[in-house]
Amino acid sequence: MEVLAAETTSQQERLQAIAEKRKRQAEIENKRRQLEDERRQLQHLKSKALRERWLLEGTPSSASEGDEDLRRQMQDDEQKTRLLEDSVSRLEKEIEVLERGDSAPATAKENAAAPSPVRAPAPSPAKEERKTEVVMNSQQTPVGTPKDKRVSNTPLRTVDGSPMMKAAMYSVEITVEKDKVTGETRVLSSTTLLPRQPLPLGIKVYEDETKVVHAVDGTAENGIHPLSSSEVDELIHKADEVTLSEAGSTAGAAETRGAVEGAARTTPSRREITGVQAQPGEATSGPPGIQPGQEPPVTMIFMGYQNVEDEAETKKVLGLQDTITAELVVIEDAAEPKEPAPPNGSAAEPPTEAASREENQAGPEATTSDPQDLDMKKHRCKCCSIM
C-alpha cells in the first residue's frame, strides 16, 4: 500500500510539473507576441514623430493654431513612446526570467518519480551514498537541455542533436531600401541563388530552425538591428510579390514582342529593287501577272441570247440592217499576174515585195511548174465584199 501511495503521489507531482511547464511556455509565447506588437507600435510612433518634427522645421517662425496642435500631438507621441519603451524593456526582462525558470533544474521529486514495478531491497549505506551522488549529478544537469550545445553561424543545422548536419537548399538575395523619414522598408529586387559555401561577409540578424538572415551591406550606415520573426516573414512576403511582378512583366513583354513579330511576319514589307532599268516600251502600270508586250485580258459578260430565223431579223439584231455591200472584180493580165486586193480593204503590198515573197516561197521549182497550173492562175479571179 505504501508503494502504491508513493507511486500515485509521484505521478501526480510529475503531471503537475508538466502542467506548470506548459503554462509557463504559453505565458512566454503570449509575452513574446505582446512584445512584438509593442515594438511595432514603438517603431510607428518614432517614424511619426520624426515626420512631424520635419514638418515643424519647414514651417515659418510665426506660430499658428495648426502648429500648436502639431506640437501638442508631438508631446503626446513622445510620452507614448517613453511608455512603450519602458513596457518593451519590462517584457524583455520578464521573458528572460521565464525562460531561465523554464530551463532551471527539476526538483528532486521529479527526478525520483520514475515508477519501479519491483520493490528493491533496503539499500546499504554505501549504496545510499552512491544514489545521492547520482541524484546530485542529475540535478546539476537541467532536464531537457542538451549536454553539448552547438553554436553555428551558418544555415547548417543539427538533426535531433546528432552531429549530422543538414545543408541549406537555396539562398535568396534581397535588396532592401529603408526610408529614413517614414521608416518603411521597400524591396527593390529578389534573386534566388544556390547556397554558397563561403558565406557572404555580414552580420547575422535572425536565425531559427529553418532560416538564417545575414545583413551583408549597409550595416555601417544603418547599424546592427536584429530582426524579429514577423519582420522576416513580411520581408519574405514582399520579396515574393516583387518576384511575381517581375515574372508578370517579363511574360507581358514576351507576348507583346511575339505579337509584333507575328504582325511583321504576316505583313509583307515593300522593298525597292535596285539595278533594274525600265525600258521605254514596257508596260509598267499593267495588272499583275502580265508580261511586257502581252495584251491585257478582256472581260466578257454574257448578256443573254435570242433565236432569230429570218435573215433580215438577224441583220437587225446584229446591227447590220443599213450596211452597204460592194463587190470588187479584178481581171488579171496574162503577162503580169497581180495579187488581188486584201479582203479587209487595206492597202495592197508593193509588187516588188510580193514578187520577192513569191520567189522565196516557191523557190527554184516555180520556174519549172506545169503550164496547166499557170493557166489556172491566169483564169482565176477573186472577189471580196466590203461591208
From Swiss-Prot:
MF-aspect GO terms: D3 dopamine receptor binding
Post-translational modification Phosphoserine, affected residues: 116, 124, 162, 245, 346, 369
Positions where N-acetylmethionine occurs in the chain: 1
GO cellular component: apicolateral plasma membrane; axon; basolateral plasma membrane; cytoplasmic side of plasma membrane; cytoplasmic vesicle; dendritic spine; filopodium; filopodium membrane
Compositional bias per record (Low complexity), positions renumbered to this chain: 104-117, 286-296
Tissue specificity annotation: Widely expressed with highest expression in brain and testis and intermediate expression in heart and adrenal gland.
Cystine bridges: none
Residues bearing a lipid moiety (S-farnesyl cysteine): 384
Complex formation: Interacts with dopamine receptor DRD3.
The name this protein goes by in its record: Paralemmin-1
